[in-house]
Amino acid sequence: MSFLELARKRCSIRKYAPKNVEQEKIDYILEAARLAPSAVNYQPWYFVWVQSAEGKAKLQECYPREWFKQAPYYLIVCGDHQQSWKRGDHKDHMDIDTAIATEHICLAAAEQGLGTCWVCNFDTELCKPNKYP
């Protein structure tokens, strides 16, 4: 599929099938994220894959939407301000870098036939990545 076909295919999905995703697809998606460009190649991100029932229940407290509860997995994209590049006027590029990595994830998932949806309107105090087994 061409890039434009992939870009047309990728959209926010809010209804998910209750099935497992093959490990090969997960690895492929994470590799696409790892290859995402970042300012000065600092790669100030890390990813938390949440698949346990306990972890999913905790994460659902951060974003209590019915459609969100249907997803078989969650991938939390986290950024580290201590590792991100700051330009001369102190603009921190962590948000830009993690957004690029996130879209790499979404495009790779679409290519693999998987649906994704960015979630940005979550409770930041409840959503701490070390809380999700």
Predicted regions and their residues:
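Acidic, surface-exposed loops and disordered segments
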Residues: 1-133
